[in-house]
């Protein structure tokens, strides 16, 4: 009886493991960090003003989050919009994985207070940035490496 239980458990583990290995090898890529990408359209003539504004907020918060190990990296991309409705700035933040986003407010609210001040100061700064830009959207995307 004991041998039958051991054999049954061994077969079950082997079947589970073979499914796991097969599922891993079927993907044509390996998963990397998760990127939060925000598409920003600055208002006419306001790009430099907006970049100066986020030098404290976005950069300051990102540097602190990176120092604390909450994010892997961050980037700001500046380009020419392809149409009047297109973005010209991408704000990108890389997280190790999706789990790094769990309980985000608990992790990032203290950084916001440290960098921008009390919540009412943060709101005032956000309203002022609204005069400089429009947020066209935000995407959460996974970086992949093709096999």
Language-model segment annotations:
Residues 34-36, 87-89, 134:
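Residues that flank catalytic or metal-binding motifs in active/ligand-binding sites
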Residues 26-29, 60, 64-72, 92-142:
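An amphipathic, aromatic/His-enriched active-site/gating alpha helix that lines ligand/cofactor pockets
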Residues 24-49:
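Immediate post-signal-peptide N-terminus of mature secreted/exported proteins
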Residues 16-23:
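Sec/Tat signal peptide C-region and signal peptidase I cleavage site
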Residues 146-147:
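Short, solvent-exposed mixed-charge patches
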